[in-house]
């Protein structure tokens, strides 16, 4: 057994893998002593994993259709990601950027990007065909990575909550990094070591903190611009009192009851929408922390 990131053989057993779906049965979680990545072993059979991913939004999220409040959350979350990217490198609204997004799902980030940067040429790779109709209506080109040669010279490659589902991350990402133009950027968002605060490990196979992400970028010969913790800190996610108030705020949100929150105006300044701001209050998606939190956001550059 070797680490999927650094190829070290210095691996330590952590715990039996927690799952419900049979695709993830009889696994264990291991940790690399060198780069500190946590990962599943054995990895799922490719055929079973492909079948799961081809209906991912049904398997993991109960379908790709979203009600008004769910849409507000995902659109608002996408706006915080775009705000992070713009804050790191700057974006020109009238520039014809060429984008490749891997695993866009129903297309929340596509919608946000194209509204802000309408001259962009936007390509996607999405294995879940239930999402294709909506993506086509947004004016994107849907590529088939197995049958269609990817174009060269992308300005941005985008992966939000994709990399944690991959069995061979270096091989997977290198194929896309090679298609980036010189000076192009790779944006990644992944959960940060979410086995620490969740009751199940599935459907994630890789569990990142900053160190393994740094090693990953080195392996790809990409220059790290920023790796940052966003969302609720782990120490709050495992605090019973804070979780009680989180559930209470979630209840008020579902009932349509507004409440005071010190971050409301900061979020609204980013998302420019009352409903989206309300949807994000419980998640700190706009806020960077110095200690491990819900998500890692990563921006790197090809030199």
Describe the residue ranges of each PLM region:
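Short, conserved loop/helix-junction motifs that constitute active-site signature segments
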Residues: 116, 178-181
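A short His-aromatic
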Residues: 161-165
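Conserved N-terminal segment of class I S-adenosyl-L-methionine
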Residues: 1-160, 170-173, 210, 229, ...
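S-adenosyl-L-methionine-dependent methyltransferase catalytic module, highlighting the catalytic core
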Residues: 148, 167-178, 185-301
